[in-house]
Amino acid sequence: MDLADSQITQGNEIIQSMGLTNVRLLEYFIYQVGSFTIQSLTQHIEENKEFANITENELYSAVLSLVILGYVYVYLTTYPIYSFEDNKTYIPKSFTQYVKTLVEGANQYIGAGNMYNGDVEDLNKLHLYIMSQMEKPTTKAELKSALQGYLIQNEYQDMNNNDKLIDETYDCTELFNALFDVLTRLGISSL
C-alpha cells in the first residue's frame, strides 16, 4: 500500500467514524449550501430534529476531520460573489486576455485561482468565449444566444447525441449554467 492509498484508507475510516447523521449534515452544507460557519451549522441542527443528537464536540470533530482531509477549507473572511445583473455586469478585457493566455497553454506554468488561492480548473475555450462576450455589459439572454451561435458556428456536437451537431433547437441552458459555475469559482459573477 503506497502513501496515497494509506491516506485514502485513513480518510474513509475518519468519515465512517463520524456517523451517518454527521456525514449527511456536512454533505448538505458542502454540496448544497456551499459555504457555512459553525453558527450556521449549529442553527441548522437546532431547526432539524434528525440532527438533534449531534453534540457540539462531534460537530467540531467532524468539521476538523473534513478540514484535514481537504474537503472543507477554513477562511477568516468571506468570499464576495457578485450576482450577474443584466446590462451592468462586465469583465475587464485585460482579465479575459489573462484567461486566454492560460487556456492557450500558459496553464502548464501557472494556474487560475480564486481569492483563497484555490485552483480553478477546467477553464476552456467556451469559458473564454463567454468572458469575451461580457467585456461590455450585456444580458443573460444575449449571452445564451451568443453561446448557441458559437456552438453552431464551430460545429460542436450535441452532448446528448454525439452523432448530431448542435443546431437552433438545442437548449444550451445546462451548459450555460455549468460554464457560469466555473466562472463563479473564479470570482467573476454568479447567475
Swiss-Prot record:
The chain crosses the membrane at residues 59-78. It is found in: Membrane. It is a single-pass membrane protein. The keyword Membrane applies. It comes from the Bacteria. GO terms for cellular component: membrane. Its main location: membrane. Keywords: Membrane, Transmembrane, Transmembrane helix. This is Uncharacterized protein HI_0096. It comes from Haemophilus influenzae (strain ATCC 51907 / DSM 11121 / KW20 / Rd).
